[in-house]
């Protein structure tokens, strides 16, 4: 339809024109955003139906090396008032005004919108955030991360946040995008090991994580999980183990969220071991290539949480 065409073309056409016709020395993102306000007014007069994500609120999280996980809200619309709620209610012109990044404390149901002169500019952004024991914590894994997960800063560069990537940023992945999932090419018989230093003895009784199903892209969800604790980061004791079963759809991809609960235990170091979801058949489960007939499925993991 013409409306769909408008949505796909605008304001992309303006961005293409800006990058193609402007000298590199003169390119200015802030100035471009300021001029886009007038462009959208012109498009409205022309009865064009552009994509209006320009007016939406983007939800980012970021942790400095030793700091807590912070929530950052931004809109490309210049000088917009960002109003937000943390209880799942719809934001209004009288909701809390966003003035600076704030610490993520506990699980919140964040909703935010940009306002101008008391009027909501476009849609409400909805993003649950999970302020668990691991939120904002650096971690180590025993595999090289492929898809690195998180984005941060004005250029949204993949993997720019070196402390959290996609595993401890407080945001769970979903079916809509591969961001902020983190991928691991699993070797048969070798589990993924994720380790976090909690810095002090901490009571833990539950671990939650997500994994992705999409065999066409060589992904199967986790087949099992085990939890180990340590006081010194050297000697670990397993305190829980669980086999995982999932009902797969006929086609497409789906995100699964799994949890494992156990008797409260003290941990200074927490290790989560995630097992591969199994094997895939070359040319049957995914497009045929010159590789082996049977391969271990990749693990795509997001937001490992502890409570």
What kind of region is each of these model predictions?
Residues 1-41:
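Conserved alpha/beta catalytic core and glycan-binding cleft of carbohydrate-active enzymes
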């Amino acid at each position: 339809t013409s409306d769909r065409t408008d949505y796909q073309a605008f304001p992309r056409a303006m961005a293409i024109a800006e990058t193609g016709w402007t000298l590199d020395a003169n390119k200015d993102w802030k100035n471009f955003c300021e001029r886009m306000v007038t462009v959208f007014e012109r498009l409205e007069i022309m009865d064009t139906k552009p994509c209006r994500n320009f007016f939406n609120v983007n939800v980012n999280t970021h942790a400095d090396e030793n700091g807590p996980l912070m929530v950052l809200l931004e809109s490309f619309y210049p000088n917009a008032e960002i109003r937000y709620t943390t209880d799942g209610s719809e934001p209004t012109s009288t909701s809390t005004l966003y003035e600076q990044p704030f610490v993520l404390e506990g699980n919140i149901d964040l909703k935010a919108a940009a306002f101008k002169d008391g009027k909501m500019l476009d849609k409400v952004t909805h993003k649950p955030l999970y302020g668990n024991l691991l939120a904002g914590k650096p971690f180590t894994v025993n595999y090289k991360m492929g898809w690195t997960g998180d984005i941060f800063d004005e250029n949204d560069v993949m993997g720019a946040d070196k402390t959290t990537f996609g595993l401890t940023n407080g945001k769970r992945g979903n079916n809509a995008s591969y961001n902020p999932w983190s991928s691991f090419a699993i070797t048969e018989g070798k589990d993924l090991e994720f380790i976090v230093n909690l810095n002090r003895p901490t009571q833990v009784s539950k671990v939650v994580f997500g994994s992705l199903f999409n065999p066409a892209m060589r992904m199967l969800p986790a087949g099992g999980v085990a939890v180990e604790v340590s006081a010194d980061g050297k000697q670990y004791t397993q305190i829980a183990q669980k086999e995982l079963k999932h009902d797969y759809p006929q086609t497409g991809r789906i995100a699964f969220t799994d949890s494992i609960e156990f008797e409260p235990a003290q941990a200074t170091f927490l290790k989560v071991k995630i097992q591969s979801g199994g094997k895939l058949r070359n040319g049957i489960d995914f497009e045929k290539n010159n590789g082996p007939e049977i391969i271990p499925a990749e693990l795509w993991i997001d937001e490992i949480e502890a409570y």
